[in-house]
Design a protein with these regions (language model features):
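Cysteine-nucleophile protease catalytic domains, especially the papain-like/related folds used
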Residues: 1-47, 54, 69
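Conserved beta-strand termini and adjacent loop/short-helix elements that scaffold enzyme active sites
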Residues: 48-50, 111
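Intrinsically disordered, low-complexity segments enriched in polar/charged residues with Gly/Pro
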Residues: 51-52, 62
Length: 152
């Protein structure tokens, strides 16, 4: 994941170099390990638990997300889907569901599966990991390149 984010900003690090910096083990790597490696190559990092609305509206992309509570992916795009015109005047007839609340596409780079596109519902099912005061949250690592990143 970190390699993908570094490439986004124009730097190419070997996988081996980043693995050694992140202290990867047989059981994988932690968000702290990724954060330490990122700071080692010149990123400023912040780990957060966020609601979907915070991720969608406030987070600069790309960022790294904890995925299915077992590995990490890069979120590189969140786009509102074009709305299909509704043929009903106000609300759909009883029995038909409106999908107006789920109208985003989330673009994810998964080191295991490649470039993927998820509907909001699919994405949230994989990303949510916690509920705080009735609000569902997921974990992300925000990365911002510093001047040091570009000088290394």
């Amino acid at each position: 994941c970190l390699r993908m984010v570094a490439m986004h900003y124009g730097k190419n690090y070997s996988l081996q170099s980043l693995r050694s910096r992140s202290f990867i083990t047989r059981s994988g790597v932690s968000m702290l390990g990724i954060s330490n490696a990122a700071e080692d190559i010149g990123f400023r990092t912040l780990g957060y638990r966020l609601s979907w609305e915070q991720l969608r509206d406030e987070v600069p992309l790309p960022c790294i997300a904890h995925w299915n509570q077992r590995h990490f992916v890069v979120i590189y795009g969140i786009k509102k889907q074009r709305r299909i015109p509704c043929i009903f005047n106000r609300t759909p007839p009883e029995g038909l569901k409106s999908n107006r609340s789920r109208n985003y596409l989330i673009y994810v780079a998964d080191p295991a599966s490649g470039l993927l596109k998820y509907t909001e519902k699919e994405f949230l099912r994989c990303w949510y990991s916690n509920q705080k005061e009735g609000i569902k949250e997921g974990a992300v690592l925000l990365l911002e390149p510093t001047q040091e990143f570009f000088l290394l």
